[in-house]
């Protein structure tokens, strides 16, 4: 692992990391992303987070496999959503439509915005950081972002066209035109 970069007043700021350099970073038992060239390190997801993400992955995965709509990506798959400085985000679940899948599979973190991104909130998530992730996904071209809040038992839906909505636990998550035909009662994954 490269030496940690430190900033001392009066000196030049530390060099920014690239998506390619991030491939070589190994921090056991941590989740990492690259945000505008700066390494972001987080604790592993907790029990509730993993359960909710797993429940939705099973339902969404069954639909994607049955319809052959595209490819589902598991938690912590990195996608390069900006260059210069680089930003590599790793959602809890991502879906890319079949016609947009790169061929052959790219090495590393592809310059590709998933069509659907799912973020499951953890107790330590800060609202500003979550909204920054949503903004990064949408500006990169993601069409639909679901932010699921297990504690409040709601999901916030953000769309590329700028519209937003809230799904209560007694309502249904809908794949809209991004994952056609997919719907899932929110309560069934919480």
Which residue stretches match the model-derived regions?
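Gly/Pro/Ser/Thr-rich low-complexity, intrinsically disordered segments predominantly at protein N-termini
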Residues: 1-190
């Amino acid at each position: 692992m490269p030496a940690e970069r430190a900033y001392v007043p009066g000196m030049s700021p530390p060099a920014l990391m690239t998506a390619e350099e991030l491939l070589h970073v190994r921090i056991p038992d941590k989740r990492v992303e690259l945000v505008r060239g700066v390494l972001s390190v987080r604790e592993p997801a907790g029990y509730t987070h993993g359960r909710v993400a797993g429940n939705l992955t099973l339902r969404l995965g069954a639909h994607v496999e049955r319809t052959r709509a595209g490819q589902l990506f598991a938690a912590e798959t990195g996608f390069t959503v900006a260059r210069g400085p680089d930003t590599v985000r790793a959602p809890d679940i991502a879906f890319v439509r079949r016609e947009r899948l790169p061929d052959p599979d790219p090495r590393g973190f592809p310059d590709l915005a998933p069509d659907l991104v799912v973020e499951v909130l953890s107790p330590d998530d800060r609202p500003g950081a979550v909204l920054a992730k949503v903004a990064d996904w949408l500006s990169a071209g993601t069409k639909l972002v679901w932010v699921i809040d297990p504690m409040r038992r709601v999901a916030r839906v953000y769309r590329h066209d700028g519209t937003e909505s809230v799904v209560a636990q007694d309502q249904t998550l809908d794949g809209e035109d991004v994952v056609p035909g997919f719907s899932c009662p929110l309560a069934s994954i919480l």
